[in-house]
Amino acid sequence: MSCSQRLRLFLLPIAALLLAFSTDAFITVAYGQPQTPNGRAVLTGVVTDAETGDPLQDVNVFIAESTTGTATDAQGRFRITGVPLGAHRLYVSSIGYEPAAQNLNLREARVYTIDFALQPVVIEGEGVTVEAERDEKWQERYAKFQRLFIGETPNAEQTEIKNPEVLRFEGGVGSLEAYSVEPLIIVNRALGYRVEYFLREFVATPGRTRYDGEPLFEELEGSVNERERWDKARREAFYGSSHHLMLAMLAQNTERHGFKLYMRPASGGSFDGNGGPMGGGSLRAGGQRYPIEVGDIMKNGEVATERVLDFQGFVEVVYLGETETEAYTTWLDQYASSGMIRRNVPKFQTSQFWLERGPATIDYKGDLVDPYGVTVSGFFAFERVADQVPKEYRPR
């Protein structure tokens, strides 16, 4: 799963984890491949205390889901150069303040000035919990958090949260809520990344899980053999992901990249109580689907570098490049009930996506201007933090 899937909102209707990202409603139009703009942008600004107006030093300022970021100087100033044009989410965070973010759609190669005034916040609760004070209940909550946040794939087995003591857990029977008082430091030795994850909210209740946060990636240093292994693993994580799909759709060659697209009308098959289709690669019996072309769901945008997804119902995606993994089929069996699909043998990786907020704009990089408009399920949603690569990643 690519990080352009925006790990902001997950819904877990028993057999599928649903993830928020951005999409639209149904129209058949002809369109061309979006143009790639020339030049780069520069982001500058000042970060201040909202109450006093004083500049804030050493504030994290970064482009979410990327490797690009910086920190403010003594005057609260920041400057990020060489930013590709298109859609980005600029995120600002400092301990003791409410984080802030702004969605950007950079269409011109120029300097953009974005100032932030952060609101002070009092962090309630106890300080860092030492190992000896973490009781059995804490360990149970943490284990559940790891499964739902890091994931249950082979890559998750090589991914470690280095500072779990910054997590705060709440919740009663069957529910779990969490947030971090400092960025989570996650080391992914499967893909070769150190990730700072700024987790604002995590909520898991029976049948539903969601979390909201922003990752900043940094490549790990490694030996020649390690770098070769990471390069292979990153390619595997990218191929078949939602970001791979978006780039293939923009290039109008989905089949060449191994994707088959189908439309399922909203009235076909069964939907869960939250208004979304059941995940896990299929609907309950009775759902109808028919093959579609990219032009059936995508139209020209306002400018030549953008396209707009626009459809009703939901799109089912079959990736012929890989079959379902054993970890995925085990996950399905674990969460499936008698009324849902069970998978006896692996099939090609199958996912769905549908609209949350109406038409959504995609830039030439495959990034969504509004990161919250689309929900995905099936294999796209099964792969979580341990399978993310930075949004600018492209296979070499």
Question: What is each model feature region?
Answer:
Residues 11-25:
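Bacterial N-terminal signal peptides
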Residues 27-42:
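Beta-strand-rich domain onsets/edges
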Residues 41-49, 76-78, 116, 127-128:
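A short, amphipathic beta-strand motif
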Residues 41-43, 50-65:
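Short, ordered, surface-exposed loop/turn motifs in non-cytosolic proteins
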Residues 63, 91-103:
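A short, solvent-exposed loop/turn motif at the edges and junctions
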Residues 66-77:
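Short, acidic Ser/Thr/Gly-rich low-complexity loop/linker segments typical of extracellular
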Residues 70, 98-114:
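Structured interaction patches on ligand/partner-binding surfaces of diverse proteins
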Residues 118-396:
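Surface-exposed, low-complexity/disordered segments
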